[in-house]
Amino acid sequence: MRLGYLIVGCAVALLATTDGVVDASSKHKQLSTDVPRPADDISSERFLRSQDTPEDDGNPAHEDRGYLTVLTNAAMHPLRERKMKNQIANLIKMDATDAELYAAGVQPHRLFDVIRHKDESVEMSLSQWVTMVHQHQFPSDYIWKSQAYRRFKQYAGFYDGMQRNGQRVASTT
């Protein structure tokens, strides 16, 4: 097991040190869709970096950073998910209204996931729940006994209404 960690660590270190170091002009041929640039005007050695193109929108999130970013994002994804769920849980603890949840950018399926963990009677994901409802695998009055499902259904209706009215909020959670 330790050997596996050593190999993965070495691979990450190798990718981190060589990411973007190799000269793009020597390794890759210019495609017909690439913007022709003289070698003097290239501000970096990285291949297909968005700052080198005239369509640069200034957003660093749209920049291609290579293997290191992919590995970092894969490692940080569970932490971001936990942070979002904690934010939603804090809103629920403060008895936030539907409008406050919507203003915070909470999507209905994320609200259901957070409520589901607080309510012991809900032991399945939203997609499993909806599938069972449509297949009539348990009585319909069972659904309405769950506070989690009632809260989710109320917020989902509010969310859909706001989306239909064109009052869109950037989804942050």
Swiss-Prot record:
Region feature Disordered, mapped onto this chain: 25-64
Keywords: Host cytoplasm, Host nucleus, Secreted, Signal, Virulence
Subcellular locations according to the entry: Secreted; Host nucleus; Host cytoplasm
Motif residue range(s): RxLR-dEER: 46-65
Bias (Basic and acidic residues) ranges: 37-49
Primary subcellular site in the record, as a coarse category: secreted
Induction text: Expression is induced during host plant infection.
GO cellular-component term (any): extracellular region
Signal peptide: 1-24
The organism's place on the tree of life at top rank: Eukaryota
Free-text domain note: The RxLR-dEER motif acts to carry the protein into the host cell cytoplasm through binding to cell surface phosphatidylinositol-3-phosphate.
Homology family: Belongs to the RxLR effector family.
Function, in words: Effector that leads to host programmed cell death.
Identification of the protein by name: RxLR effector protein PITG_10232
